[in-house]
């Protein structure tokens, strides 16, 4: 059959920009999927999706005008039911054949197949392959029905009676197979043709008559002034943004924001980047405020200098390309000025009150109906932060003479004071005008206002950083004060929400508990904090009084699950991760070293045998119940058990010393020499001896072995 390329376009009013790319991919993807299912494409068919503010389209190569005829075998009924004793068709069989468009003359051609215990009749026929127009109609209906439409509109067709539900009113449908219009294809009250429309203002031809499926993109570009491909349009905008920054000079660069670039790509059909500017006096306002208002409200790209500082210039992606762009530039500069003036006003007004003076206002801000106000939350965070700071300082002071002295006490008092001040003031920017207008700036504005109030840098940084990390890959708090307050804030959220039963379910996580858990993990691991997880959770629960249930064990499971998932994403195998997490390590900061030790151990020749033996030991001890690891040498009878005991006495102290010093790799490698005595023990010694004293002694020997082997990880989890 003659393959031709297929083009389908749905021409609509301006689509929601944040949903455009998803809509375009879904529309084209379902069309291809449905045509493939009907046998209308080849094995080499390729899909190109198009999506612009006013169109969704798909170009599919090697599409057949009709699907090939297909042999169909339909199960009818058992022979005993369909044929009588003389081999004549029964009324039941004749009725079934009539329903299939056949008659008694077809009975001799029926196929008999053994199906289980009975012989069954099958009717074989050739099904006519679907015509492309019919197949496309089905595919188009399915593609429209499956579009991930964020919000549906209802509108009437020109007849004034028929209502249509779609994301935006549709005004045109193109369906071309090669150069031929697929007659009869319809969608949303429209009949397919070969005409579409280009740019609202700059098309040189309107309507644009598409000559063939393959000329679609080029004709829209040359005649319609439209770049139909989302990806090509995005790349063109990125190119123009950089070119405009280069023209400005001085090493400036446009801010990098993939989401903003996607949104702007969905707003224009023919991008034209222009350089605009605002008064330099606005640069006295924190740049985060100016950047956010330009990006969120105006979809502008601020220009940053080589040091990442905001300049007074910005880039606008216009949808028109006039010969004289001065009016467009002036219009955008005029529009942004009031936005920046508002930000300056908020900043100036907010600084008239100190953060301390705003603390009482938090008592009027509801946090959660079961957990009270933001004021109550602040007191909980202070309680938790003090406990964490004390634990941290105590851990750091161990073995550190400088901290375990009078100077150390002064340092501890300063740390506790800074932590308490930061925890007290961390949420006060929630009641400022700036954060009320731009919630995304919470924490950031608190840091600026803390500097304005003359607070120590550690406190200002902690207030700014206490929400970090906000997302995957985000920076962590800079100093210990910020780390402590950030940990306290996240633990308050986790313990509180778990305590009232607000747990993540499936895709729903309204309180971002997964993100909070990963934040706790990242800080503990990447900052190498000498803090125990159970101690952290235990310090947080009392802060809630009787408002919550103590769900520390459940929350710990949740955190270990998040940790395991994160480690697998970092490239560790499921077995390696499982072996370490099975021990529920308290110091998460040590987990990376444990994993590296396990990975090195698995490369040893002795590893498989020791892992298998460890699994066997685990099962024996599990059945034995409580086992005393004490070994009575006088009860050791067999040479193999004496050799194992001697090996443990010789190598375990060395392995333990290496473990205690943090050299987990060396510890496991030292224990690898136990392979031979362990193998010999299981070959030659009956563990469950009839004599009780002998049995308990051998179980104790295995317990001693088990304790020595599984300090770094549960090696039984490595057994294949």
Swiss-Prot record:
It holds the Pfam family DALR_1. Keywords: Aminoacyl-tRNA synthetase, ATP-binding, Cytoplasm, Ligase, Nucleotide-binding, Protein biosynthesis. It catalyses: tRNA(Gly) + glycine + ATP = glycyl-tRNA(Gly) + AMP + diphosphate. One of its GO terms (molecular function) is ATP binding. InterPro entries: DALR_anticod-bd, Gly-tRNA-synth_bsu, Gly-tRNA-synth_heterodimer. SUPFAM superfamilies: HD-domain/PDEase-like. Its main location: cytoplasm. GO terms for cellular component: cytosol. It is found in: Cytoplasm. One of its GO terms (biological process) is glycyl-tRNA aminoacylation. It is an enzyme of class 6 (ligase). The keyword Protein biosynthesis applies. Its EC number is 6.1.1.14. The keyword Methyltransferase does not apply. Tetramer of two alpha and two beta subunits. Belongs to the class-II aminoacyl-tRNA synthetase family. HAMAP family: Gly_tRNA_synth_beta. This is Glycine--tRNA ligase beta subunit. It comes from Acidovorax sp. (strain JS42).
């Amino acid at each position: 059959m003659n393959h031709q390329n297929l083009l389908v376009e749905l021409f609509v009013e301006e689509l929601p920009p944040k949903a455009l790319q998803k809509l375009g991919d879904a529309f084209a993807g379902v069309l291809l999927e449905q045509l493939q299912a009907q046998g209308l494409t080849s094995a080499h068919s390729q899909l190109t999706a198009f999506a612009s503010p006013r169109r969704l389209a798909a170009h599919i190569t090697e599409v057949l005008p009709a699907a090939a005829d297909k042999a169909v075998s339909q199960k009818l009924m058992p022979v005993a039911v369909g044929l009588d004793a003389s081999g004549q068709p029964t009324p039941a069989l004749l009725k079934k054949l009539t329903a299939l468009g056949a008659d008694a003359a077809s009975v001799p051609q029926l196929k008999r197949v053994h199906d289980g215990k009975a012989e069954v009749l099958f009717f074989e026929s050739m099904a006519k392959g679907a015509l492309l127009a019919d197949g496309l109609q089905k595919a188009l209906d399915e593609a429209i029905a499956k579009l991930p439409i964020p919000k549906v509109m209802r509108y009437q067709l020109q007849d004034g009676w028929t209502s249509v539900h779609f994301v935006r009113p549709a005004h045109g449908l193109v369906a071309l197979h090669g150069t031929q219009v697929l007659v009869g294809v319809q969608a949303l009250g429209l009949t397919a043709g070969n005409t579409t429309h280009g740019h609202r203002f700059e098309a040189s031809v309107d309507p644009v008559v598409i000559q063939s499926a393959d000329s679609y993109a080029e004709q829209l570009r040359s005649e319609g002034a439209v770049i139909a491909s989302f990806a090509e349009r995005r790349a063109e905008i990125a190119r123009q943004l950089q070119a405009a920054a280069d023209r400005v000079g001085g090493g400036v660069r446009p801010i990098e924001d993939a989401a903003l670039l996607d949104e702007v790509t969905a707003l224009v059909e023919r991008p034209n980047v222009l350089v605009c500017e605002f008064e330099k006096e606005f640069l006295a306002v924190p740049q985060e405020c100016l950047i956010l208002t330009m990006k969120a409200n105006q979809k502008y790209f601020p220009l940053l200098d080589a040091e990442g500082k905001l300049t007074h210039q910005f880039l606008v992606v216009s949808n028109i390309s006039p010969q004289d762009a001065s009016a467009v530039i002036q219009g955008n500069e005029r529009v942004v000025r009031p936005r920046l003036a508002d930000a300056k006003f908020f900043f100036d007004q907010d600084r008239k009150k100190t953060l301390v003076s705003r603390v009482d206002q938090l008592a009027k801000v509801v946090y959660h109906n079961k957990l009270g106000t933001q004021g109550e939350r602040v007191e909980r965070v202070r309680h938790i932060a003090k406990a964490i700071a004390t634990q941290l300082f105590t851990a750091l002071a161990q073995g550190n003479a400088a901290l375990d002295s009078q100077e150390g006490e002064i340092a501890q008092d300063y740390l506790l004071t800074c932590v308490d001040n930061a925890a007290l003031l961390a949420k006060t920017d929630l009641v400022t005008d700036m954060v009320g207008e731009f919630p995304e700036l919470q924490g950031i504005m608190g840091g600026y206002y803390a500097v304005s109030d003359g607070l120590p840098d550690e406190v200002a940084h902690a207030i700014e950083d206490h929400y970090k990390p906000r997302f995957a890959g985000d920076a962590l708090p800079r100093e210990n004060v910020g780390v402590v307050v950030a940990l306290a804030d996240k633990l308050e959220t986790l313990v509180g929400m778990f305590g009232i039963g607000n747990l993540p379910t499936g895709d729903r996580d309204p309180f971002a508990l997964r993100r909070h858990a990963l934040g706790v993990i990242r800080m503990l691991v990447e900052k190498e904090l000498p803090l125990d997880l159970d101690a952290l959770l235990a310090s947080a629960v009392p802060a809630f009084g009787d408002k919550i249930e103590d769900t520390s064990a459940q929350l710990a499971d949740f955190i270990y699950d998040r940790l395991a998932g994160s480690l697998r994403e970092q490239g560790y195998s499921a077995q390696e991760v499982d072996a370490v997490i099975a021990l529920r390590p308290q110091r998460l900061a040590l987990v990376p070293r444990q994993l590296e030790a396990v990975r090195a151990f698995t490369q040893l020749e002795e590893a498989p045998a020791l892992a298998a033996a460890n699994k066997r030991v685990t099962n024996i001890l599990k059945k034995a119940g409580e086992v005393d690891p004490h070994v009575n040498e006088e009860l050791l009878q067999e040479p193999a058990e004496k050799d194992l005991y001697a090996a443990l006495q010789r190598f375990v102290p060395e392995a333990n010393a290496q473990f205690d010093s943090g050299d987990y790799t060396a510890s496991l490698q030292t224990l690898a020499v136990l392979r031979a005595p362990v193998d010999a023990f299981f070959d030659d010694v009956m563990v469950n001896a009839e004599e009780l004293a002998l049995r308990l002694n051998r179980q104790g020997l295995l317990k001693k072995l088990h304790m020595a082997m599984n300090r770094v990880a549960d090696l039984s989890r490595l057994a294949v």
